[in-house]
Structures are given as C-alpha cells and as structure tokens.
C-alpha cells in the first residue's frame, strides 16, 4: 500500500466517524440530504430517488440517484464522501440482479418499478437495532446515525356497503 492509498484510507475512516454512511446498493431507494449554500444562508435539500449505479473508488466513490420530477427523469451523481452531503437514508431495499440500472432510463411507469427486497430490509433493521443497543450500552448514542425505515404496505380500503 503506497502513501496515497494509506492517506485516503485514513481520511475515509475519519469521515465515517463523523458521518456514518449506510450500506446501500443499486436498486435501493435513497433519501440524500444535501447542504445547499445560497448567498450567506445554508439549508438542507432532500433528494429522493432510486440508486441506479455505485462507483467504489476509495475516496473518489460516488453513486447515481434517479428520480422522476414532473414527468422528466432527473439523475444526479453524488460523491460519497463529499462534505455537502449531510446524511444518506435508505428508504427501501430493491431486489435487482444488475450492478448498473441504466435500463431504467428507457422505461416509464410500472415497468420502471423495482421489487422491494423485504428480507434485506428486515436484516438491515435487525443490524440497526443491534448497533443502537451497543451504542446505548457504551453511552455513545448519536443523533446523526443512518436511518433505515421499511416502507410498509397500507391495507386496502374496505368496500362501502350499498344501502
């Protein structure tokens, strides 16, 4: 390992201590909180969409998130360790068999949907509970931990009775 790789590894460890990055892969629906500076004000903007690609290259790692905004597909590439990213939340896990989901660009509506991977969501919740219990035991419960929420299905409405 040369000195540059060693320096990058140290920087990644320091960044992970400050802001945890959750485990996610292409197909997952992400909610990325981005710091936006407008003049002398700073605010956090939320960008939610499907992760269609992930590039793992040490400190230069990035991921692409695609969402449909007013009928148009919008893709944004985020550097994983950028200081402008406040936090990343995994909204739901997707079940896909590809590393790059560029085929979603040509699809619309139902054909662009990704099946939810319920087993991965349950495993992630179990791991998250274990981590939170360990933090409570050690007294280091932080508010900036990555959040994983399963998106449950709502029950179908009951049909109305005819009078």
Curated annotation (Swiss-Prot):
Belongs to the bacterial ribosomal protein bL19 family. Gene3D superfamilies: 2.30.30.790. Residues 151-163 have a biased composition (Basic residues). Residues 131-163 are annotated as: Disordered. GO terms for biological process: translation. One of its GO terms (cellular component) is cytosolic large ribosomal subunit. The keyword Ribosomal protein applies. Keywords: Ribonucleoprotein, Ribosomal protein. HAMAP family: Ribosomal_bL19 (MF_00402). This protein is located at the 30S-50S ribosomal subunit interface and may play a role in the structure and function of the aminoacyl-tRNA binding site. Pfam families: Ribosomal_L19. The keyword Ligase does not apply. Transmembrane segments: none annotated. InterPro entries: Ribosomal_bL19, Ribosomal_bL19_CS, Ribosomal_bL19_sf, Translation_prot_SH3-like_sf. GO terms for molecular function: structural constituent of ribosome. This is Large ribosomal subunit protein bL19. Residues 131-150 have a biased composition (Basic and acidic residues).
